[in-house]
Structures are given as structure tokens and as C-alpha cells.
Amino acid sequence: QIDADGQHDADDVPRFLAEAQAHPDAVINGRPLYDESVPMGRLIGRYATHVWVWINTLSLDIADSMCGFRVYPLAATIALLDRERVGLRMDFDVEVIVRLHWSGLEIRNLPTRVTYPLDGVSHFQLWRDNVRISMMHARLFFGMLWRSPRLLARRLLPAVRG
């Protein structure tokens, strides 16, 4: 997956695909390296989501939960989408990576340059998407509580996956 908003460096596609081939059962996740074009409001909003993701996974494994540059392991992702109802807008990327992490998949974070073009178009709907994201974080928080014994066991006993 690479968002079509022109923010991500498409020259990194071969590196992401090579990492996915080397680790076919892992999520290859972009870890943005921002330049001076990044709006401060977006950085703050993204950080708030990252904190919730770290709480909801009881880990720091997901370096950036909102990056639109990823390679998903297909079978695990299809299985997840077949059994769970996940968001379809700005909440999709966050919810999918959290749920894949819950299922025991490794998250491999690769640095990638991100720029915000001056003439870029955002499809973010301020109120609607913030409400969706807040509701998603609440659902994930309660999902984490239910899964917390297994998530904590995974942290304490790394051989426990899934």
C-alpha cells in the first residue's frame, strides 16, 4: 500500500518489497522521516494516535501507526478483514496494524521520506474523521483490556506469539 497523495517516496518501493520478501509474515511499515513541509498540527495529531496505539498494543513495536506506506502479509490481512469489521477511512491503517500486531505478526519499521506538497490535497474530514478515530481508539482500548493477559505474556515470554 502506498497512499496516492504524493507524500511518500516511491523510490523506496523496491526496498519495502525486498523486506517483505525477506520477512513474508511481517507487516512492513513505513516510519516517516519528515522534512520542514510537515504541518505542526499533523505531527501533534499523529503523535496522539501513536500514544494510543502504544497503549492499545502494550508495546512500542509500531513506530508509526498512520503511515500510508506499508506491505501487508496478504493471507493474515485477508483473514483479519474476513473476521473483523475495521474502519474504511483514516482509521483503517491504524486499526489494521494494531489488530495484526494483536494476532502476533511482527512489525518491521522502515524509514521513508515524507513530504507535504504545497498543492497537496487532503481527504481528511476534520470532525468526521476525528470522531471515527476517537471511536476506533476506544474500541481498541477495550480490545486491549480483553487481550492484555496474552499481550503481557508475549512481552514477558517472547516465544508466545499470536
Segments from the language model and where they lie:
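Acceptor/aglycone-binding surface of glycosyltransferases and processive sugar-polymer synthases
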Residues: 10-90, 117-124, 128-134
